[in-house]
A protein has these predicted regions:
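C-terminal accessory segments of proteins
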Residues: 19-314
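Fungal secretory targeting signals
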Residues: 1-24
Length: 314
């Protein structure tokens, strides 16, 4: 549980020059944006200590040292072992501080997607999660992001999803399941769909939901609102057909071809009429499974936070 109190934070998304991937056209757009921001700040009186030099700097996952990735992974697990702030009367299924964030998203889903609040709400949401990791779990860094274009052609072999000890875990076991309909298209299933096969989150549990699972065999929640206790494994179907919608071209065009916030948010979130899931929907369906593929319950998969940190960056 967290409060949307007013907060002013100057955030700089760090580039990934030290990572193994060549910087692309989207990275170069960031360079232009930072130069414009620096010019803008230079014209303003320094009423506070905020500057590019003092700003929070978030890093791309592949540019983090292994020790930094492990620090983030361990902080996430510590948050999942801390007691919740929601009471059992408010959210009967919550069992951890991590679940607090999931419950908040479930309860507000319908007012924070496909509305004007989408970007601002999720920006603060990721910030609040980042602060919880730092203030409550001893995390020394800031929320990392995944630069989708680096991995869009082969997400399963990316440092995010390759399943090694410094990844966010990888795919789930092979389980037959349906594709993902979106407008006039259906994204075919990939080769997962079951419980995680390995990696640091293999034994991580989802406790809430499902509310709108795309998988038909997920045990139902005892409550209609999805807030009852329903412990189960994390399931994924890492899908390269979905990740095509997060490619360099899709991301670059999203930023450069939408001239107002309405068209930008609409294109980003997904346009059902044009059968385009957008980078937002494409990123979520790349993770897929349960809870990652559940519109309401997706934050219950820790990969959510890297995806939405990139939404913030974009």
């Amino acid at each position: 549980m967290f409060s949307f109190a007013p907060v002013l934070v100057l955030l700089v998304i760090g580039n990934s020059e030290a990572g193994p991937y060549a910087r692309d056209s989207v990275d170069r757009l960031q360079d232009i944006g930072l130069a414009n921001l620096e010019s803008h700040l230079a014209r303003l009186p320094r009423a506070s200590g905020c500057s590019l030099e003092t700003a929070i700097k978030r890093k791309e996952w592949s540019s983090l040292a292994v020790e930094e990735r492990l620090d983030y992974i361990n902080a996430t697990k510590r948050l999942a072992n801390k007691p919740p702030r929601y009471s059992m009367d408010e959210v009967p299924g919550t069992r951890s501080r991590y679940d607090d964030f999931v419950a908040t998203h479930i309860q507000q889903t319908l007012s924070i997607h496909f509305t004007a609040k989408f970007l601002s709400w999720h920006r603060y949401y990721v910030f609040a999660y980042e602060q919880a990791l730092r203030d409550e779990c001893g995390y020394r860094g800031y929320q990392p992001y995944e630069h989708w274009p680096y991995y869009s052609s082969d997400p399963l072999n990316s440092p995010v999803f390759n399943g090694n000890d410094s990844s966010m875990s990888g795919d789930g076991a092979k389980v037959a399941h349906d594709g993902i309909p979106f407008g006039n298209i259906t994204i075919p299933p990939a080769n997962g769909g079951g419980c995680l096969l390995g990696g640091p989150f293999k034994d991580f549990e989802a406790h809430l939901g499902p509310v709108a699972s795309r998988l038909k065999d997920v045990p139902p929640n005892p409550r209609k609102d999805g807030l009852g206790y329903n412990p189960r494994c994390l399931r994924r179907d890492i899908n390269p057909e979905s990740s095509k919608f997060t490619s360099e071209t899709y991301t670059y065009d999203l930023i450069t071809k939408n001239k107002d916030i309405h068209s930008f948010q609409t294109s980003m979130q997904g346009d059902m009429q044009r059968s385009n899931p957008g980078v937002h929907g494409g990123g979520h369906t790349t993770i897929g499974g349960d809870p990652g593929g559940d519109f309401f319950n997706s934050p219950a998969d820790p990969a959510f936070w890297l995806h939405h940190a990139m939404i913030n960056r974009t």
